[in-house]
């Protein structure tokens, strides 16, 4: 078959399977692995063997970079302790534990080769963890920890694997000092090269205004970091992650809005293709692995139980480490220690991916039991993706861990956008001149507050059947844009206008329509969230019946405090009428006074990042 047809076939399978999985609500990685397994046994299908260069150089750098630029550097820093405990401590523990088990059960495997297998299967996969965690709807802190762990742990695992390979080739032990030096060199070199690459690329990016050139530079960025780090025996993985984190954090300052939008869209497309190709290729590896074991003439009665035991050891090692570390943190009363529910989810979220399979091929070809090690690695990848990936949503629901709250997000967004609008209006008052037309200033003020008003309107949409002004604007403006586009297309058919003029006019309409679609999609997601019941045991009748949000009567703080000339400490929002009053720690205690005056029992915090409610009538926290 022609290579072009092979590529077309891969893309077609990926598109069809991904669309089908999304339609029925299944995880794309799981379905693609299963489809790959089935395809691998179809006669005359091209056999694609994963090689270390293909995965570690072709796939891994862009996939890590795509994940890193979307990872919050602030969240990464805030969760650095659990990330390091998982990405370094857990990988080392898993390597030792799985290695000892593999040495015991896998036929014909030496101790060094067994530890190599332990290093191969120790790190969870960045793509698998991110895909499943976001689809499940885990709390954001868990997602941040899992993303951070999966971005960094490959570096630790590759150091452990290189150490095991050195022992295999030298047929001698490797000293702890040698292992420590390898790790320090890999980590230090990777971080250093990553920082240098990030600041080098940032200096270039400052001078680029063309979104096409900026996106081209972005595609080169992973390799600008990865290849030099590998040359100095540093961790290319860490270099890519550091570069991605820094450039993603600085993107709003370094890039124009057009460049950021173009980069985001292009990387989402690249990430979609690479991620799904990776999982399809994982499934396609099963037939060559089985053929290799068959050629070794090892009894299947020994191989199958050994692979199952290695899979079990991989899962158990993570559970033991995560629960053990969580217990220590709780005993030490460490700030931010996980609850047992969070601990259970983190312990179970250990899906492996393509790096595990590719790393097997780094072993020397004459390694005893190499085919059996490869099949064991595939068993771990497929087993964790299927077993943990399928049961993780059930576990999250069973433990009643709630994911991101759309209503709380909307409340924070409304507060944030309001503050931003005030900042913009303040700058307008500073920079305006006497010669600026009054109608232009009025238009700018109106536009500055419109986004703020739209944000607060979204909060009240589920509480009323009346169409908010922003929704009315969206409905009518979309009809206008459709008519405008039709007029331009009709003019195009007459041949009276230049093509470049027509394309520019259509682009302007497309950009406005895309912006309106994003605003309306966010509002629709909020509506879906607000109509979902979130009753919990222990809530009183007032808390159960009260709405979760209400449109505030003012955005300027406590009205009574403003009137009396006093200062408030924190603000509270009445969920019956939207009155904004100060808390009991404030001098006026106007929120409590509002309850005494009106009898409205339930209020909620009106502070960014806080979603708790309080019933004055029953003195109960909701």
Residue ranges of each PLM-predicted region?
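Short cysteine-rich clusters marking metal-coordination/redox-active sites
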Residues: 558-561, 574
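Cys/His-rich, Zn2+-coordinating zinc-finger modules
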Residues: 534-557, 564, 579-622
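Cytosolic C-terminal regulatory domains/tails of membrane transporters and channels
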Residues: 401-535
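Transmembrane helical cores of multi-pass secondary ion antiporters/exchangers
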Residues: 1-415, 419-422, 489, 493-496, ...
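Canonical RING-type zinc finger of E3 ubiquitin-protein ligases
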Residues: 566-575
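In a subset of proteins, long, contiguous C-terminal domains/tails are tracked
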Residues: 2-6, 500-533, 576, 594-622
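Short, positively charged
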Residues: 42-43, 257-258, 469-470, 547-554
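Short loop/turn motifs at secondary-structure junctions and domain boundaries
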Residues: 269, 563-565
């Amino acid at each position: 078959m022609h290579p072009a047809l092979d590529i077309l076939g891969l893309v077609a399978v990926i598109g069809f399977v991904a669309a089908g999985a999304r339609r029925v609500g299944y995880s794309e990685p799981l379905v693609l692995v299963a489809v790959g397994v089935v395809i691998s046994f179809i006669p005359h299908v091209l056999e694609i063997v994963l090689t270390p260069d293909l995965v570690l150089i072709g796939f891994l750098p862009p996939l890590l970079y795509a994940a890193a630029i979307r990872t919050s550097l602030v969240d990464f820093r805030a969760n650095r302790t659990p990330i390091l405990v998982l990405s370094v401590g857990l990988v080392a523990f898993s390597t030792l534990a799985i290695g000892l088990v593999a040495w015991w059960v896998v036929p014909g495997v030496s101790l060094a080769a067994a530890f190599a297998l332990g290093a191969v299967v120790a790190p969870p996969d960045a793509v698998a963890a991110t895909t499943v965690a976001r689809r499940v709807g885990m709390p954001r802190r868990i997602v941040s920890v899992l993303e951070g762990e999966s971005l960094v742990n490959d570096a630790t695992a590759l150091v452990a694997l290189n150490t095991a390979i050195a022992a295999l080739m030298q047929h001698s032990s490797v000293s702890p000092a040698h292992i420590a030096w390898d790790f320090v060199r890999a980590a230090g070199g990777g971080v250093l090269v990553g920082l240098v690459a990030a600041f080098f690329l940032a200096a270039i990016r400052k001078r680029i205004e063309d979104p096409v050139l900026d996106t081209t530079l972005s595609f080169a960025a992973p390799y600008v970091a990865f290849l030099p780090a590998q040359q100095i025996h540093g961790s290319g993985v860490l270099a890519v992650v550091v570069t991605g984190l820094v450039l993603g954090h600085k993107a709003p300052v370094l890039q124009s809005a057009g460049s950021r939008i173009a980069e985001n869209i292009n990387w989402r497309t690249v990430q979609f293709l690479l991620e799904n190709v990776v999982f399809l290729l994982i499934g396609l590896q099963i037939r060559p692995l089985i053929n290799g074991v068959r050629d070794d003439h090892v009894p299947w009665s020994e191989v199958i139980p050994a692979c199952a035991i290695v899979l079990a050891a991989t899962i158990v090692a993570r559970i033991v480490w995560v629960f053990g570390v969580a217990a220590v943190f709780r005993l030490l009363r460490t700030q931010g220690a996980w609850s047992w529910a969070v601990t259970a989810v983190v312990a179970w979220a250990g899906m492996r991916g393509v790096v595990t399979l590719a790393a097997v091929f780094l072993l020397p070809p004459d390694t005893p039991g190499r085919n059996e090690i490869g099949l064991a690695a595939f068993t771990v990848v497929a087993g964790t993706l299927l077993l943990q990936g399928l049961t993780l949503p059930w576990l999250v629901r069973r433990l009643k861990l709630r994911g991101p709250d759309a209503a709380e997000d909307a409340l924070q967004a409304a507060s944030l956008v309001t503050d931003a609008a005030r900042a913009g209006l303040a700058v307008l008052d500073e920079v305006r001149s006497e010669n600026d037309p009054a109608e232009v200033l009025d238009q700018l003020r109106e536009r500055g507050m419109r986004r703020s008003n739209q944000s607060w309107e979204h909060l009240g949409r589920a509480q009323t059947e009346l169409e908010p002004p922003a929704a009315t604007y969206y409905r009518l403006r979309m009809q206008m844009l459709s008519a405008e586009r039709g007029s331009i297309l009709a003019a195009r058919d007459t041949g009276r206008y230049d093509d470049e003029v027509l394309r520019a006019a259509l682009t302007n309409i497309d950009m406005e329509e895309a912006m309106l679609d994003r605003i309306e999609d966010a509002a629709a997601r909020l509506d879906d969230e607000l109509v979902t019941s979130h009753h919990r045991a222990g809530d009183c009748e007032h808390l159960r019946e009260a709405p979760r949000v209400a449109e505030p009567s003012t955005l300027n703080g406590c009205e009574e405090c403003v009137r009396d000339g006093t200062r408030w400490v924190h603000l509270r929002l009445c969920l019956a009428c939207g009155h904004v009053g100060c808390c009991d720690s404030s001098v006026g205690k106007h929120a409590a006074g509002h309850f005494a005056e009106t009898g409205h029992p339930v209020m909620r915090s009106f502070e960014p990042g806080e979603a708790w409610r309080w019933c004055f009538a029953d003195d109960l926290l909701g």
